Amino acid sequence: MALDTAIISGASDGIGAAFTKILIKHGWEVIGISRSDKKLNQLKKTIKINKKNFKPYVCNVKDIKKLMSIAKKVNTPKLIFLNAGIYSPVDSSQNNIDTYKKHIDVNYIGVLNCYEAFLPKMLLNKNGQIIIMSSISGWLGLPKAAAYGPTKAALRSFGQSIRYDLHSKGIKVQVCSPCFVETSATSLNDFYMPGLMNVNKAAELIYKNMKLNKFEFSFPFLFSLFMKLFSLLPDKLSSYVIKKNIS
């Protein structure tokens, strides 16, 4: 019996690596995409069960031609996990234009490149699922996230749009908007991060939620609920509390 195939961008680190291992443990074939050959090899060494089901591909998500070449070689995906991204905290009082552009190129355009490359086979199969990794910083602006947050807001909006187009094609779209997760990215933050979650726990929650019939999911529950409520409050009140509790 053929295995279900998942495409995971940003597979070699953080949530991507943790989710890769969970899917392989549950019998999936994973096409892991990362720009780092070294990290992909390190990840493969940590996979103890069904190691042969991990198929690493070195590719920068900015390279649409190479992504399309990979798409031609691999099995039709049942899941496209659009996860690759970067995070650099910025002081928005400084000149950050190169950082802003880099975040847009990787976090937004990179996701679109992967989407465009791997969607056609899924459409032919008229069955599948797409999970887009956004963030609570896509709900409202957070300290130090002037480069990162807008790209995640764009991804959330993108997911909201494509779900209508793809529903009739048999493709389920979800957006995952986690709070703070322990990764190499969040280790760059110099402020208190409420509800900071272990990356393996986060990946387990993604696996659990991908089976549910809901568009957007976030975790941990209490802090994500807190942030959701604050995104609905008057700006004066929400910005005051964020300054007191996060910055």
Segments and roles (model prediction):
Residues 115, 151:
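Active-site helix of classical SDR
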Residues 175, 191-225:
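C-terminal helical subdomain
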Residues 83-89:
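Conserved NAD(P)H cofactor-binding loop of Rossmann-fold oxidoreductase domains
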Residues 135:
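Residue(s) in the substrate-gating loop at a strand-loop-helix junction
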